[in-house]
Regions:
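Active-site neighborhood of phospho(di)ester-bond hydrolases with catalytic His/Asp-centered motifs
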Residues: 36-40, 58-68, 151-156, 172-176, ...
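Binuclear metal-dependent phosphoesterase catalytic core
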Residues: 233-258
């Protein structure tokens, strides 16, 4: 199993400026299947840039109906046969979405997840996780393959029970928009992430989806500080970062730059 980050920028200003790419990330060879998670602006181009073929996708995960998460979903759906998402991306909710046209929906198998709802997909259990964000129908995801769990918070503010949705995660991937205590509604800052890691205690934590304030410092230094404070190995993802998942010892990885 391999995880590759096709973009690590987050929020509208990072997406517009492209100081970091916004292509989301891929999970490849998960029980022999390949998935793209939150394909924001440029995801298709970055797919080819980093040596992948979108026609080999088996699924697309879209957490919510904000452009930096769903922008390239339609063109990826053109290239594959299944889509996985949340309700507002497909149906819309008040002023959010829909992000996927009826035409593209008709050409893929759809799974709509809500918090704690579980779907069995290609030999994996996929659970929706609660988020507190601008899109009230948004979700994160926890993928369970033979007891090995990868959790993704997507965009969410910190709330008291957040850790319960990501309980048991071996790898926790989180959208951490801002450094230090610089919290903003609907997003995690480093302080929030530290609290979450102390509660979930994953074997490996990865920060991504960086806003301009995070990028104005060095996210790598921020990750080192978080590692020291929590005892959880924490990485700051970068564009083109790729690694094979070590299911026996997730914290022991060899990172490649594509």
């Amino acid at each position: 199993m391999k995880i590759t980050f096709l973009g690590t920028g987050g929020g509208r200003f990072s997406a517009i400026s492209q100081r970091r790419m916004t292509g989301g990330f891929r999970i490849d060879n998960l029980n022999g299947k390949n998935y793209h998670v939150d394909p924001g602006p440029g995801a298709l181009v970055r797919t080819y840039q980093f040596g992948f073929d979108p026609r080999n996708l088996d699924g697309v995960f879209v957490s919510h109906a904000h452009t930096d998460h769903y922008n390239d979903a339609e063109i990826l759906i053109e290239a594959m046969t299944r889509g996985m998402t949340n309700k507002s991306v497909l149906d819309g909710y008040e002023r959010w979405g829909p992000g996927i046209s009826k035409y593209h929906q008709s050409h893929s198998k759809k799974y709509v997840l809500e918090p704690n709802q579980v779907e069995n997909i290609n030999g994996c259990s996929v659970k929706g996780t609660k988020t507190v964000h601008g899109d009230p129908e948004g979700v994160g995801f926890q993928i369970d393959y033979r007891g090995f769990k990868i959790s993704y918070t997507s965009d969410t503010g910190y709330f008291e029970d957040l850790h319960k949705y990501h309980e048991g995660a071996d790898i926790l991937i989180a959208s951490v928009l801002r450094p230090g205590n610089k919290s903003i509604r609907g997003h995690l800052c480093s302080r929030n992430f530290i609290e979450l890691l102390k509660e979930v205690k994953p074997k490996l934590a990865i920060m991504t989806h960086f806003g301009l304030k995070m990028l104005s410092i060095d996210p790598i230094d921020e990750a080192k500080r978080i590692t020291k404070e929590t005892g959880v190995k924490t990485l700051a993802a970068f564009d083109g970062m790729s690694f094979e998942v070590n299911t026996q010892n997730p914290a022991r990885i060899r990172i490649k730059t594509l």
